[in-house]
Curated annotation (Swiss-Prot):
It is found in: Nucleus; Cytoplasm; Cytoplasm, Perinuclear region. One of its GO terms (cellular component) is nucleus. Phosphorylated. InterPro entries: Cell_cycle_regulator_Mat89Bb (IPR019355). Belongs to the Integrator subunit 13 family. The keyword Cytoplasm applies. Residues 564-577 have a biased composition (Polar residues). This is Protein asunder. It comes from Drosophila pseudoobscura pseudoobscura.
Amino acid sequence: MFERNQKTIFVLDHTRYFSIASEEYISMDFLKGKPSAHSSAGGSSQFSKSLWTCACESSIEYCRVVWDLFPGKKHVRFIVSDTAAHIVNTWSASTQNMSHVMNAMVMVGVPSRSMPQSSDYSVIHGLRAAIEALAEPTDEQSQAMASGVPDDLILNEGRVICITSARDNTSMKSLEDIFNTVLIQQNVLSATPPKKGLGINHCHLVILNIVPLGIDSMVTNRNLLEISPLLDVEIHTVGAPDISYKLTHLILDHYDLASTTVTNIPMKEEQNANSSANYDVEILHSRRAHSITCGPDFSLPTSIKQGATYETVTLKWCTPRGCGSADLQPCLGQFLVTPVDVTSRPSSCLINFLLNGRSVLLEMPRKTGSKATSHMLSARGGEIFIHSLCITRSCMDEAPSIADGPGGRVNDYRTSELGQLMKMSRMVPLKSRDPAAPNLPRRLPRYFPLTTTSTVLFHLQRHLSWLPHFLHLLVKEMDKQDEVRCQQHIHELYKSASRGDVLPFTHTNGARLKPHKAKDQYRLLYRELEQLIQLNASTVHHKNLLESLQTLRAAYGDAPSKSEAGTANLRSFTESPLSPERLEAMSNVSISSSTNSNSLLKASKRRMSNCGTRSLLDIISSAERSQSNKRLDFSGRICTPIGQIAKLYPDFGNKEKDAAAAAAASGVGVAPKE
């Protein structure tokens, strides 16, 4: 009912510091021809605004935008602070206008440079008065209180924008603490009788630290920070010439606005009426003017104007042309518009053009490269509106075909199956509570392919007689008999795959597929069956069926390389208990086969239990033993008995003795070594 942006209070610092120049010089060479040497040397043709003038102009422009777009709905107040707080206007509608504010600002005037430098001159006086002003009810809040609405249901929030100049972060922190303390004290006064105004539910404090051009500030910028449950604070340091851009950026977030720049406006030159040039005009309006128009096929062209920090949507001026009623798009909404620079010549020409009863169409580009007329500017009753036109499919158009989906034309949607699913899933009111209602969502399908080409399982349900019944059993409660029947169907499917039968697809036309392609089809069918059973495995019988199918799928690809034992084990898992071969084997089974199967089962369990009891040391020792067995051990360890020391190089020196003995036997002398 009462939003935070319903109340906005500007606190302007009127101390001596704001009398200095902003250091942005404006030329005053209005005469034709070259400037004289005397004027250029003396610099008499330039002047610079003061910090106070920059703050006043930008804040008044802020409230002009608010009052243009929200006439009578949003309120803005001004408080000037020097030795005391000076109230410029009130919440009354008679003072909520530009004439009253500008006349009051003229009476306040620029701060005097001869003003004494004293601690009595402070912005804190204005902040205290701003908190008291927030506690005062507006006309709408007074009407709600008079109608009997409790005070706790009347939301009282507001925003305070303080334009000042601080030395450093410590001074700024002191300012925040004082504001928070006064805010808490004001709520205490409002809660205790006699009540002094409304309690403040929340306050948003925006501090703009203004410095002249080219001066570095010791105050750092800070995003929105929660100081207390009642107060959020953000700090911005900005040069005096750029304060208007900063407030324009802030007003977009404060009032959920958007900036649009109308480009390529043909306009005659002021000095030469025979020629024309293209100009741009920036306007502000509600953000919904763009959000309700754009569809998935459109992207907003944005740009950032020089000197600004916010994005603006660029829409191109569309040359007016004659069109019939069939060419007009339906309007989705209309929103008030106000120009950013109301005093510029392009803005004035566009406003007069619209107020004279003309309309302007605006174009925006599509993603495909073409353009579409998305907005229209027109005036009614002295107010300018932007109309959001419907450039996407509207409710008055025929419904699109389901086959015209994204990515091209799709012709194989399962339309009839989807219709059956919708009929099965329709909701009806019940007079009494159904005890089976909690189990109904579980019975709904959890797997539904949209197209026929994306599924193998549902493509075959018209050609395999048992498949529809199989799919029906998966989504309902299953008993033992249903499980046996499904096992039988899986067994028949496995037998068909073993024989090399081709799945009865429609597109094959009876042609014989290659063996590897048929095998891939069965593999895809097994995979989709497993996915379907997994999503509906709610009972023990479903889980048993899932285990059988998982075993079949894991072994199907490696079936040719399996041994006979593996094949027998595979058959024990894949065959249904009611299959003819299985029934015959069960009738002729002997005690020995039963004993063998039990022994195999016990052996497998024993291996699993032994594997589970192995420690990390056993695993490492086993790995080292297997690695050492691959190479021959040292011969000294093999030949030397346990407890004795093996002799290193036992044959060392024996070769010389053998050579001398052989020489003596043959009578040949061997000379000793030197």
